[in-house]
Structures are given as structure tokens and as C-alpha cells.
Amino acid sequence: MLRVLLAFLLLLLVVPAAHAQPASAPPADAAAGQRLFNDMGCWQCHGYQGQGGESGPRIGPQPLPWPVFDNYVRAPSGTMPPYRASVLGEADLRKIHAYLTSLPGPSPNAPRPR
């Protein structure tokens, strides 16, 4: 009976921890992501803060969810060149995603980029 009770208590501790949300990206990841965003030239089409521009759509401040973002960057449609893992590794791409996620949203009165 004591073993069953201990097992039950252990489950009460383990199950919530398994379902806990992952920690948000540390600020260092976002700062490194901003440097990569600039170094890789993403800003040339998407603007310095991912707001979009003449040749690239808005990708920030609320980027696509990670799996969709990853797939799009690896095999984009349109004129964007593909950034294969040999050019931009997953860790670096996650940093760029963290940067885009960290950007503040646009002002409610700001005009929408074209």
C-alpha cells in the first residue's frame, strides 16, 4: 500500500513537469538572432524588424510557428532563396525566430505594410 501511495505521489510530481511549457528563448538568443538576421541579409527584403518591404512579406513581430517557419525558410515559395541547413543551421535559425518573436507588435494606428 505504501508503494502505491509513493508511486502516486511521484506521478503527481512528474506529470505536470512533463506538460510544462518550454521556457521562452533567452534574450541572448534574440540578440544573436538579430545579428544573424542582419548578417544573412534578411533585412534587405523583410525590413530591419521583419515588417516587410517591397520584395519580402512581413515576418515579424509574430512569425509563423517554429515548424512552419523552419519549413518555409528551407523550401520557400516565390523569390526567396532556400537556406538549407548547410548554409544556416537549425540553432541559428532558431535564434532568428527568437529575434522575430521578441519584436514588439506594431502600434494599432500604424499603417499596414504593403
Region annotations inferred by a language model:
Residues 30-38, 44, 48-86:
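Gly/Gly-Pro-rich "capping" loops immediately C-terminal to redox-active cysteine motifs
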Residues 86-114:
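C-terminal capping alpha-helices of c-type cytochrome domains
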Residues 14-38, 53, 105-114:
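Electrostatic cytochrome c docking/interface patches
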